[in-house]
A protein has these predicted regions:
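Helix N-cap at the start of a conserved alpha-helix in ABC-type nucleotide-binding domains
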Residues: 133-135
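ABC ATPase "signature
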Residues: 181-182
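A short, surface-exposed alpha-helical micro-motif characterized by mixed small hydrophobic
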Residues: 163-165
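Catalytic Walker B motif of ABC-type/P-loop ATPase nucleotide-binding domains
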Residues: 122-125
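H-loop/switch region of ABC-family ATPase nucleotide-binding domains
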Residues: 157-158
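Conserved signature/switch motifs of ABC ATPase nucleotide-binding domains
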Residues: 96-99, 117, 149
Length: 206
């Protein structure tokens, strides 16, 4: 609860500020972040495309020109949704419903949905933990592609080799506290803390 979170030099959270933010301020701050859950959390009643466009459609209703230009605005959002889904390899699944998809495909929809709002930071909460090993690769491939495009991401993961390959910085948590922080090379090859060494030895012995 202490410290600050800054995005593009703007303070979006300050633990020392006791002021209660308004709902509008909270919503505005949340737009800096996109969140991809480990359990997908897609809307089962909507198609893949609708899952991706829904949030932006709801936000568009707040635009002063929405009533006047409704069709054009919604068409633009639909086109954007189609492009984002194509970028994660799901252009053939836009009219499907979540239950018709594999777990890996559902997670790629969740990634596309988060990308629709063009967040400054994309946050992943164990994005592969609910997937079979065979499906993990397709999700990691999408995340690796985002890293290649210099997308800023915070990834909670137990995929150690992937974290080592794709990260600029690695943060190792132990019992909710930061145990070690550094470059992938430093943390994985030359850990400073005994706890980090113990964890890595046990992991790579498996």
């Amino acid at each position: 609860t202490s410290g600050q979170i800054r995005v593009n030099e703007k303070v979006v959270f300050d633990g020392a500020d006791a002021r209660t933010l308004s709902e509008a301020e909270i919503r505005k701050n949340r737009l800096h972040f996109g969140l991809v859950f480990q359990s997908f959390n897609l809307f089962p009643q909507y198609t893949v495309l609708k899952n991706c466009t829904l949030a932006k459609e709801l936000m568009a209703k707040e635009r002063p020109d929405f009533k006047t230009n409704k069709k054009q605005i919604l068409d633009e959002i639909k086109t954007e949704g189609e492009a984002v889904l194509a970028s994660v390899g799901l252009q053939e699944k836009m009219d499907y419903y979540p239950h018709q998809l594999s777990g890996g495909q559902q997670q790629r929809v969740a990634i596309a949905r988060a990308l629709m709002l063009q967040p400054d930071i994309l946050c992943f909460d164990e994005p592969t933990s609910a997937l079979d090993p065979e499906l993990t690769g397709e999700v990691l491939k999408v995340i690796r592609g985002l890293a290649d495009k210099k997308t800023t991401m915070v990834i909670v993961t137990h995929e150690m080799q992937f974290a080592r390959d794709v990260s600029d910085k690695v943060l190792f948590l132990d019992k909710g506290m930061v145990a070690e922080y550094g470059s992938p090379e430093q943390v994985f090859e030359h850990p400073k803390e005994e706890r980090t060494r113990q964890f890595l030895e046990r992991y790579f012995e498996q």
